[in-house]
């Protein structure tokens, strides 16, 4: 019976080559055979009064796909087919799109519906000659619509959620103030969540996106506070000893790990999300700081100088089985565990005293370099929610700005040009 069923399935694939071709549309980004998928984005059509919106949606959509590093966006000047051929698969000349190398084809129409920007997205599998995705959305802005489209296309091809509707928190130092700002995932659309007149550092997101922890000096010493999103309402969380800083939520949002200095010694602590039930995890005479949770909440990576210089260590979430992870470099800091669990991103200073971003496997200790010869400082990495992109700080343009990069480091882009500069990025969770 099993052999008969397998034979029938094989026969169906032979009889329906489109189905077989469609199977190859899945992009396995982690595969050694990975190559970018060639995709044609036809100039978006517009309804009355929506011409500017259509242009904005198209440009943002293309920019989003380009940032992922997994698409090869074809030059519209190479297109052979008539852009007005319609959206019905039966009217599309797929052979002409195939002749220019397209594997995927995107068409869209953008309209105005009162205060909303509405859009229809069509995605086609060129080799199979059929439509594979159709979406209709209404959003408040053209950029929001574009991010929605990009997330859907990314999820179709990778079978993983897109991240372009997420936000990035960062710190902007202005004259006499520190702004906690929120940006879109492409580095644009910055808005100030809260302005602090005291030093504000190290924002990190709650897993549901409803709150951001940060380190505040409003009392004169470092304390951990939280800001409600989206209105920026603050609340105190932890004040302990000489300092409490660098708070990070556990993956379930019920606990926070942080650094505190009691009696002059910095160690890693945990507490409830409301600051209660504080418990010390490390008790080494050296400095222990910068905790980051594994995605399953069972382990914590942190920085310790117990070996003489700052290195990355890993321990169980209860503080047991502390072990050194990095043995290369003499100044390793700011670890951030990937949501996929397989890598920890961190900053390291090399032999030229240049700071760069690296990755290390928490299981094998194998190290990979993300940045090199791209300015004097690349630091403070933070992962996108799908673990496929990183944001970090660079000085390669003179002033500190944010870079989006794939983990391999061969696709990088400076995505901000803030006059005051931006530091301490934290990439937020997927929207509900």
Residue map of PLM features:
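Hydrophobic beta-strand positions that form the internal "hydrophobic ladder"
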Residues: 168, 212-213, 253-257, 297-301, ...
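Structural motif
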Residues: 116-118, 176-181, 221-225, 265-269, ...
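Short beta-strand->alpha-helix linker/helix-N-cap micro-motif
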Residues: 28-93, 106-112
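Residue-level detector of Asp-centered blade-edge/turn motifs that repeat once per structural unit
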Residues: 162-164, 207-208, 251-252, 295-296, ...
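Multi-bladed beta-propeller domains
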Residues: 184-201, 227-245, 271-289, 315-331, ...
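Amphipathic beta-strand/beta-sheet edge segments enriched in Tyr/Trp
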Residues: 25, 87-152
């Amino acid at each position: 019976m099993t052999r008969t069923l397998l034979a029938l399935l094989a026969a169906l694939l032979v009889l329906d080559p489109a189905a077989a071709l469609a199977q190859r549309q899945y992009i396995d980004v982690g595969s050694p055979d990975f190559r970018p998928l060639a995709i044609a984005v036809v100039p978006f059509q517009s309804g009355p009064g929506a011409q500017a919106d259509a242009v904005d949606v198209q440009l943002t959509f293309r920019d989003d796909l380009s940032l992922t590093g997994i698409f090869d966006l074809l030059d519209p000047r190479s297109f052979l087919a008539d852009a007005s051929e319609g959206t019905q698969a039966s009217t599309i000349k797929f052979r002409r799109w195939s002749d220019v190398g397209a594997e995927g084809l995107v068409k869209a129409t953008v309209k105005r519906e009162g205060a909303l920007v509405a859009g229809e997205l069509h995605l086609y599998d060129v080799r199979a000659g059929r439509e594979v995705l159709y979406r209709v959305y209404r959003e408040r802005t053209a950029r929001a619509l574009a991010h929605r489209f990009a997330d859907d296309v990314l999820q179709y091809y990778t079978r993983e959620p897109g991240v372009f509707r997420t936000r990035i928190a960062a710190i902007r130092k202005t004259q006499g103030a520190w702004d906690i700002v929120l940006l879109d995932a492409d580095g644009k659309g910055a808005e100030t969540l809260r302005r602090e007149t005291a030093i504000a550092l190290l924002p990190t997101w709650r897993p549901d996106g409803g709150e951001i922890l940060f380190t505040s000096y409003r009392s004169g010493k470092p304390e951990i506070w939280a800001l409600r999103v989206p209105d920026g309402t603050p609340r105190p969380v932890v004040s302990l000893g000489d300092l409490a800083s660098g708070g990070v939520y556990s993956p379930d949002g019920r606990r926070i790990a942080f650094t505190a200095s009691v009696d002059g010694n910095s160690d890693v602590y945990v507490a409830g999300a409301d600051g209660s039930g504080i418990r010390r995890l490390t008790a080494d005479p050296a400095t222990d700081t910068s905790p980051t949770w594994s995605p399953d909440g069972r382990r914590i990576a942190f920085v310790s100088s117990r070996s003489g210089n700052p290195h990355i260590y890993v321990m169980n979430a209860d503080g047991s089985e502390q072990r050194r992870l990095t043995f290369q470099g003499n100044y390793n800091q700011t670890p951030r565990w990937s949501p996929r669990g397989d890598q920890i991103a961190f900053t390291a200073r090399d032999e030229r005293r240049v700071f760069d971003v690296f990755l290390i496997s928490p299981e094998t200790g194998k190290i990979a370099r993300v940045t090199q010869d791209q300015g004097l400082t690349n630091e403070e990495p933070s992962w996108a929610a799908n673990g496929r992109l990183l944001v970090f700080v660079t000085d390669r343009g003179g002033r500190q700005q944010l870079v989006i990069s794939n983990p391999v480091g061969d696709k990088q882009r400076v995505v901000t040009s803030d006059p005051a500069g931006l530091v301490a990025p934290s990439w937020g969770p997927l929207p509900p």
